[in-house]
């Protein structure tokens, strides 16, 4: 850069960090169509996780099946490897975000979160769900209730023209009522990406964020609650359109 500036002494220079990212922030109709296909692949991956999650199954064996399903995709179209590697958060490994899987078997009494995704021609869609082996504790059920209610509040607040910080506040009000705390952000713009990250580094759903949600933005809302010795996650990838938002995945 210094050599370029020295060679053009009469030019004026302005910072353009993330310029292309902000252009990518608003998706075309063709991109939305591609992300809908990625959403269908994410559904396939999560169904594979759901069907294969059994006590005694090794995490690595389950992840092998999940990864294969991501690449096989659907009968109509195949998938790519998502920009964020798929995650199994089991037991104490679920106390923090983004752990790698291992060769430990899934155990009775564990809470296991799956943070997966679908990718179609490098367009990524995230999807997270949580299962529990056995009878869930009152704390887990209460946290689950808060997270599900919080997701509904976020979806009600997320629409073209909304302020990102206001969307986060809708979540925070629910969390406050339950007496729970989450210090990290709850969502970000997602789209075309390569490893190691599928986020676009533009919009973030966090306090005081003043970015306006535009028409045809796509946001991965990830509600991860990581406790002292367990954790859970629920996520949806949402398309901001019209007067609200719609899910790009259809999974219970």
Predicted ranges, named:
Residues 1-252:
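Active-site neighborhoods and metal-handling regions in enzymes and metal-associated proteins
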């Amino acid at each position: 850069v210094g050599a370029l500036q020295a060679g053009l002494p009469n030019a004026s220079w302005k910072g353009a960090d993330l310029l292309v990212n902000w252009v990518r922030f608003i998706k075309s109709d063709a991109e939305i169509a591609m992300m809908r296909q990625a959403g269908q692949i994410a559904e396939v991956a999560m169904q594979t996780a759901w069907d294969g999650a059994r006590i005694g199954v090794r995490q690595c064996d389950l992840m092998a099946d999940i990864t294969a399903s991501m690449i096989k995709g659907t009968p109509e179209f195949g998938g790519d490897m998502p920009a964020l590697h798929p995650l199994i958060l089991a037991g104490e490994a679920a106390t923090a975000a983004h752990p790698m899987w291992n060769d430990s078997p899934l155990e009775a009494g564990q809470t296991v979160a799956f943070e997966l995704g679908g990718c179609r021609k490098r367009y990524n869609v995230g999807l997270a769900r949580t299962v529990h082996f056995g009878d869930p504790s009152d704390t887990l059920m209460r946290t689950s209730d808060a997270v599900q209610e919080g997701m509904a509040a976020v979806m009600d607040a997320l629409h073209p023209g909304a302020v990102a910080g206001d969307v986060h506040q809708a979540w925070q009000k629910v969390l406050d009522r339950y007496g729970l705390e989450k210090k990290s952000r709850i969502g970000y713009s997602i789209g075309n990406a390569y490893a190691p990250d599928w986020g676009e580094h533009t919009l973030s759903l966090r306090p005081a964020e003043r970015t306006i949600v535009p028409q045809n933005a796509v946001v991965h809302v990830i509600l991860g609650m990581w406790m002292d010795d367990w954790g859970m996650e629920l996520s949806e990838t949402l398309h901001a359109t019209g007067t609200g938002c719609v899910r790009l995945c259809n999974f219970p």
